[in-house]
Structure formats: structure tokens, C-alpha cells
């Protein structure tokens, strides 16, 4: 569901219809320019973070809502809305008490009933929530500030589930809507208030400082810690993104202050401007990966999958996809380069430039006899298309019959769901990417599953690995997870459900008048200051 401009005006005026037009105009122009930050971000069409996983909707939610727990820069969970909390001796009952000072933008207090309703709504669609509900016997309010989650069996990962992809807490009446019906009130308890009156879908959205928000006292760290707001207003300028050169020109002239994803080919221009700064705020970046159809020849043979692992020259792929080596790195851990559980177990296969002779030998051991290997190529995604061409060329160099199947991304997405042989419309290989930060979450990242038909595209199956993945949910400490991560990675690279192609980190660009921006996987609006 998309909110129309008329709907936004109606929603914004409903709570204060007595305001006159002149008073509204005064309110709209009262914010000083030096206390307003203009950020170039993509269009926001879905306002409900439960209705979509789109990054821009999550960024919106981070501004106006709050969460029970938040993850720091090392992917560790910390209380956010929660003050005191504890778990029973048998690890089956968690009690959470809300901290002081929590209030909705409409002036009413946040209650435990709001939290219970929000958890239940989110759990209907969130993968972590579904795990929680499969183990929960009850989620209930104890009093106005306390709620309890009772479990049928221990779930040591519960704080992490609530921190990584847990619910944005909404008012009980909003959270009472089914997840298929979008919440459009945009009333949260977070550090910013959504300005309905100034909303111009497709052009700009405005967020005003919530002067009544009480931040935590801990310093900000990733999504965790205190969310202190030092500016009066943040405006998302959407229209400026229509043309890459226009967006950079707007940054140079001061029309905007922040550009989240500047065009890679224009980074030298930004770098040469003494008034601008480039910084990789999303330090996890994205990981490009190659998925194989484990159900069909030749990749139903582990030897063929291992052959591809040895063949790939990550640097060649990354250069073709992203160009400047300053913004990419090879990846050898199944968890990427930045997770707290990243490790070097069973990574002896990695060799700069790849190992074509080893790959050729392994294809022979797999019984490969010249069968056609179909690589799905997205013609409307340059990085993916270029990477696909490099992989196809490397396969042909060692005598493999590789064929590119070009289509737009939508066509690729449709075809990758087919489990048939290539002669019946199936596929052998496709390349994609994902936020590296998600790879720290074994229990919510479906690409890290090897449970056959329930797994992500490619449908790998390894029961021994899945037993370890289930064990992850019971662990409570990082040291325990680090040890288990090594066991999992040993099996991962023996089986080879996918092949890593590398990590891409593109910096954000912003005016040097801005300070205090927090490195995170999404752009955060608190803590920044404007000189």
C-alpha cells in the first residue's frame, strides 16, 4: 500500500485541525537552515517496516520508532527500550522491564501491551519472529512496564533475535493490524517525528527532532547506545537522485549535505572537492556470491562445486563488477569479513587468481562430460552482468561448456525458482549480493541454511550442518558462537553451497560541515551535528 499525498495531509491534520494556515506556515519555516540536514535518499513508498524488508523503509523506521534491543558495531545485542531484564534458571522465562521516559509522539506513554502486540505482529512475517513463536508458550503483559516471554525450550539467541531483526515497537492499536495491512500513522516513540504536513512523496520527506525523546546514557555504537539528536530537522531529498551527476552537483553546491550511495565513477570528483568527505559508513558493505543448483548436474556433485570454488578469481570478478580496488576485498569466511564470528577455518582453497588446474582436475573427478552450464545474467544490473561474464569466461578457459542466459533481473528471479534441468528451463549458476551484516545472523539469513527444499535457491542439503545451525539458537555467549562458527564453516566449505566473489564497500559522501555520523549498515540520523 502506498500513502498518497492527500492521505498524508489528512493524517497530519487530523490531530490538530484547529491550526490555522498561517500558523502552519510559521511552523514550517521556523527551523533554521543551519539546524537542517538534507540527505539524498531513495523514495519511500512503504512506511511500515513489518510490511517490507526494504532498506529505505527500515531507515525510516529507525528514525521514528524504537526497538527493545539494538545491535552494536560488533553485532552484539544491547538493551534499547528495555531497562532491566532477566532470565529464569531454567532459561525458559524472560522478563523485560521498559526503561523510564518512553513516550509516543502523540503524548501517551509506551506500555508493555504495546510491546506484546508489536512482537506478535512482527513474528507473523519475520524469520526470527517465527523462530521465537515456534518455541514460545506465551508472550504476555505483567504490568504496564513489564512483559514476559515464556518458552517451551531455551532460546539463548533471543536477545540477538530482538536486536538484529526484532520488532519496531508500535502503539498497540497500530500493531493490532494484520501484517498484510500497512500501518500508515507513522507515530512512534523514536528520536524523530515524521512531519506529515511537509511530506511530498516522490520528492521529499521531513523528520523533526522529537524534543521529548530520552536517549540512553551509553555512547552510540552501531544501532545501539544513546540516540541523541543535535539537529532540528532532517529532510530526505529524493528528486536529486534522478540523475547521478545532478546528485553530486547538489552536494558540491550545498543543496544537499549527504549522499548515501554516490556513483562509483564520480568518486574521484567528490574526493577532489576540499569541502566534501568520503567515508564508508556501511563498513560491512555487500558480499557478492555465486549460487549453484545443487539438484542438477554437474553441481549435484560436490566435486563440481569444489571445482568452482577453486576456479574463481575474486579479484578479476570484483574489478569487472566494481572497478576501483580501493572499494573491494576478497572474502574467505562464510560469515564475510566483518562479523564477530568470522574465522579462517577450512579456507585453504583460497588462492589469489584462483587455481584453474585444480578446478579442471575436480571437474574431471566429478564426471563432467561437457554438459551445458547455464549462468543467469541480469542485463539491467551492470555489476552482476559483468561478474557473470567473467565467471563464464573462466569456465570456458578450462573447457567447460558455459552459456550465459541474459534477461532482466525480474526474469532472473523468476527462473532461479525453477528446480528443473537446464534443458527444461532450469539453471546452473546465478550471482547475487547481500548486505554482509546479515551473514552474522545464522538463524535469520536463509542463504546460510542447508536444509534442502526449505533452503534458499540452489537447495543445498547437509543434515550435519543443520544440526549445528539449530544448536546456534541455544547458545548465549559470543565465545560459544565463535567455536560453533568454526565447526559450521568446516562443513560449509567441504560441501560448498555457494562460492564467495568478494566484498564491496562503497563510501558515502557528505559535506565537511557534518560531523558525528555513525557507521552502520543503514544511514542513521541521530548524533550528527551541522556546523
Swiss-Prot record:
- GO function terms (MF aspect): peptide transmembrane transporter activity
Q: What is its main location?
A: periplasm
Mention any one GO cellular component term assigned to this protein in its UniProt record: outer membrane-bounded periplasmic space
Post-translational modification here is noted as: Predicted to be exported by the Tat system. The position of the signal peptide cleavage has not been experimentally proven.
Entry's Pfam families? SBP_bac_5
Its signal peptide is 1-32
Q: Which InterPro entries match?
A: Peptide/Ni-bd (IPR030678), SBP_5 (IPR039424), SBP_5_CS (IPR023765), SBP_5_dom (IPR000914), TAT_signal (IPR006311)
Q: Where in the cell is it found?
A: Periplasm
Q: Which GO terms describe its biological process?
A: peptide transport
Which terms are listed as keywords in the entry? Periplasm, Plasmid, Signal, Transport
- Its biological purpose: Probably part of the binding-protein-dependent transport system y4tOPQRS for a peptide.
Family label: Belongs to the bacterial solute-binding protein 5 family.
Q: Which PANTHER family match?
A: D,D-DIPEPTIDE-BINDING PERIPLASMIC PROTEIN DDPA-RELATED, PERIPLASMIC BINDING COMPONENT OF ABC TRANSPORTER
Q: What's this protein's name?
A: Probable peptide ABC transporter periplasmic-binding protein y4tO
Organism listed in the record: Sinorhizobium fredii (strain NBRC 101917 / NGR234)
